[in-house]
Amino acid sequence: MTQLTREQVLELFHQRSSTRYYDPTKKISDEDFECILECGRLSPSSVGSEPWKFLVIQNKTLREKMKPFSWGMINQLDNCSHLVVILAKKNARYDSPFFVDVMARKGLNAEQQQAALTKYKALQEEDMKLLENDRTLFDWCSKQTYIALANMLTGASALGIDSCPIEGFHYDKMNECLAEEGLFDPQEYAVSVAATFGYRSRDIAKKSRKGLDEVVKWVG
């Protein structure tokens, strides 16, 4: 694999900018979008939990149903090439069947599984206090989905594809709408965040960011 230069890496991030208006005549190829999804699937997550699912919503009727409560992507639902809604796992306790599957994927033997469970219990109960209420535990899983989201956005930029991460919608109504469509079990998952992908239809103003010296503090 040819290694990118530092300049090429940074160019991907300068090039990526939240796209509000897409060209509806330009569609992402199946191969390119599968690559973007793989960027999400291959992302890291806390204790390798992978507490996410990716809903790729291409159905125009469903997108239309989403408009009344999706103010943050009202201009994009008609014109973006692809829409992804990322779900986060609910009730991902260390002693749940979900974590049994996590350990099975890792190929752990019985002794290793018990050691892992002990660590997961300490993490959730003591280190992060995730078991205080259902929302705290869900938010932990939701944080993991943002790692996958970021990698999908950067992967898209590497392919010359534009994107926009979106939180601008009514979460209860979005959950209700998608669950009623049978897209997920609301007892097991809930909406975390969304993103649109496609090709921009107009120029985007140069992004403004804080200087490196404002956000970085070296210690030692």
Curated annotation (Swiss-Prot):
Signal sequence range: none
Residue numbers binding NAD(+): G155, A156, S157, A158, L159, G160
Keyword NADP tagged: yes
EC class: oxidoreductase
Keywords: Flavoprotein, FMN, NAD, NADP, Oxidoreductase
Entry's Gene Ontology BP terms: 2,4,6-trinitrotoluene catabolic process
EC number: 1.-.-.-
Taxonomy, superkingdom: Bacteria
UniProt keyword Ligase, yes or no: no
Annotated GO CC locations: cytosol
Cofactor(s), by name: FMN
Pfam families named in the record: Nitroreductase
Molecular-function GO terms, alphabetical: oxidoreductase activity
PANTHER family: NADPH NITROREDUCTASE, OXYGEN-INSENSITIVE NAD(P)H NITROREDUCTASE
UniProt similarity note: Belongs to the nitroreductase family.
Name this polypeptide is given: Putative NAD(P)H nitroreductase
Organism (species): Haemophilus influenzae (strain ATCC 51907 / DSM 11121 / KW20 / Rd)
Lineage of source species: Bacteria, Pseudomonadati, Pseudomonadota, Gammaproteobacteria, Pasteurellales
